[in-house]
Structure formats: structure tokens, C-alpha cells
Design a protein with these regions (language model features):
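Conserved beta-strand/loop scaffold segments within soluble protein domains that form the structured core
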Residues: 1-238, 242-245, 259-291
Length: 291
């Protein structure tokens, strides 16, 4: 299909195996633009895991402008994994909108490892109480690649939570943006919102622009945000070299450890294994175990 996917999960249904949405782009000798739209409806007390991948099979320029809408009904659970590891000729603008009802849990993990320009716009709207929204991501890029993460969590009603944790590793002349926004409305008392963005610049020519934002109109909330930008711990790297670990492998291990907090929350073993392999490939080393 070239128009996206429609996924409907009925009430009280738990889908045993993950559903995959794989976007293949082919072309002859011309640049290609595609605009898929995915609609995912998960009814009350239903549970589903979804994996989305983008893959270009052409050497010509490709632009994908995608929209995904997820509606999670009362007590629904959705785990969504985005794997972005495309060629340098491919660019992606990914727009995801999620509406949650009471007692629902939705997690979105975004793994950005390739492509020319990637922009992830991720928007959560909490329309009920006791909702949990989880946003996590890992970015590892090099060359002149660019990745944007723009997130929004809109707390509209009381007694809800959101958790954001994004890690970035930038090499060569790569650039990145993290713009995370949390809005807590006046009625959304007892909100618990956490936002953290940590970045490592492997090259002194790499750039990351980070802007965590909180807009709080309620007075009984627990909200925090933070951002760090730095380089690998030279002391830790020296310590590893003193114990016989080559510098290249030592750097890889430090980066694995840096990203591990995001990988820990991946619930599908095959996805976790694949992401581990992608990280190792991006770092250019072979590590004989998973962290």
C-alpha cells in the first residue's frame, strides 16, 4: 500500500505478536516524495506493540512526510517503536499525534541512526485521569546528518504522568535539535512530569541545540526538566585502556552505557537486540554481549 496503514484493536484484545509497519521507497531515476498516513485505534483495555521502519531502496533523493495518529481508549496499552536507519539520500518528516483516555499507557521509542535530515514531531494529548505517557529516544549520527526531536506533552486533566528521556551521540559535522515542551493546564493538578535530554559530542565540529520547556498553570504538580551536553569521560576511557581495553572499544562501551537507560525500557527482545546491533554498527565495532 502507498497510503499508510489502518490498525484497529478491539476491546479487551491483547495482540500476542508485534505488528510491523515497513515503509519501503523505490524509484527509477527521479527524486521521490511520499506522504503515508497511519491510523491506529486501540479500544478499551486492549494491548498492542507496533514497530515502524523506514527504508529507501533507491539511490535517488527521497522525502517521506508521514503522519501517524494513535487513539488509546480507557485502560489501553500501546508500545510504539520507530526505527530510522535510512540512506544519506533519504529525508524524513515524521508527525505523530497521540490521544489518550483515562488509565491508558502509551510509550513511544524513537531510534534515529541514519538519513540525511530527520525531523520527529511527537505530540501527546492526555484527555482523562491516571494516564501515563512515555517518550524515549536514541540518536546516533555522523557526517553531515541532522536529526530534530520536537516533543509536546499536554497535561489537560489531573493525576497523570509523563516521562521523557532522550539521548544523543553526534560525530563529525552532524547536528541535532531537541525541543521538548510540557504544558500543564490549571485543572491538571497532581501532575508528575519528567523531561531529560543528554547529549555527547564525539567531534568538536558536531552541534546540538537543546531547549527543554515547561509551561505550568497548576500549583500542585511535580515537574522537572534537564539537559546536558558534553564529551566522553576521558578519565573513564583512560581507566579502561589501562586494563587492556583498546581505545575504540572503550569508547563504544562508554556510549553503550550512555544509551542503556533507554534500551532498558524496550519490551520486545528482538527489537532490543536489533538496536544493540545497530549501535555497534554505528560505532564500527563488534561487542560480544548486550548491555
Amino acid at each position: 500500500a502507498n497510503e499508510g496503514a489502518y490498525i484497529y484493536i478491539p476491546k479487551n484484545v491483547e495482540v500476542e505478536k508485534p505488528i510491523q509497519i515497513i515503509n519501503f521507497t523505490t524509484g527509477n531515476d527521479v527524486a521521490t516524495m511520499i506522504q503515508p498516513r497511519n491510523l491506529i485505534v486501540v479500544e478499551e483495555n486492549a494491548h498492542v506493540q507496533i514497530i515502524e521502519r523506514h527504508q529507501s531502496l533507491t539511490d535517488n533523493a527521497v522525502l517521506t512526510n508521514s503522519v501517524t495518529e494513535i487513539f488509546a481508549a480507557k485502560s489501553a496499552t500501546v508500545d510504539f517503536y520507530k526505527i530510522q536507519n535510512d540512506k544519506d539520500n533519504a529525508s524524513l518528516v515524521d508527525n505523530t499525534y497521540i490521544e489518550q483516555k483515562s488509565n491508558s499507557v502509551v510509550s513511544v521509542h524513537t531510534f534515529s541512526f541514519g538519513g540525511n535530515i530527520t525531523r520527529n514531531n511527537l505530540n501527546f494529548y492526555q484527555r482523562g485521569e491516571h494516564i501515563d505517557s512515555i517518550l524515549k529516544g536514541i540518536t546516533i549520527i555522523e557526517g553531515k546528518q541532522h536529526v530534530d526531536h520536537h516533543t509536546l506533552v499536554h497535561h489537560i486533566e489531573p493525576n497523570c504522568e509523563s516521562h521523557q528521556d532522550y539521548k544523543g551521540i553526534f560525530d563529525a559535522r552532524s547536528t541535532g535539535v531537541f525541543n521538548g515542551k510540557v504544558i500543564v493546564e490549571k485543572e491538571a493538578q497532581k501532575t508528575n512530569a519528567y523531561q531529560q535530554n543528554n547529549n555527547v559530542l564525539v567531534s568538536d565540529k558536531a552541534t546540538i541545540n537543546a531547549k527543554p520547556q515547561l509551561e505550568i498553570f497548576a500549583d500542585d504538580v511535580k515537574c522537572s526538566h534537564g539537559c546536558t551536553i558534553g564529551q566522553l569521560d576521558s578519565d573513564a576511557l583512560f581507566y579502561m585502556q589501562q586494563r587492556g581495553i583498546p581505545k575504540k572499544e572503550g569508547k563504544a562501551l562508554l556510549m553503550y552505557a550512555f544509551a542503556n537507560t533507554v534500551l532498558e525500557s524496550v519490551k520486545i527482545p528482538e527489537v532490543k537486540q536489533r538496536i544493540n546491533k545497530l549501535i555497534a554498527a554505528k560505532l564500527g565495532v563488534h561487542i560480544g554481549f548486550d548491555l
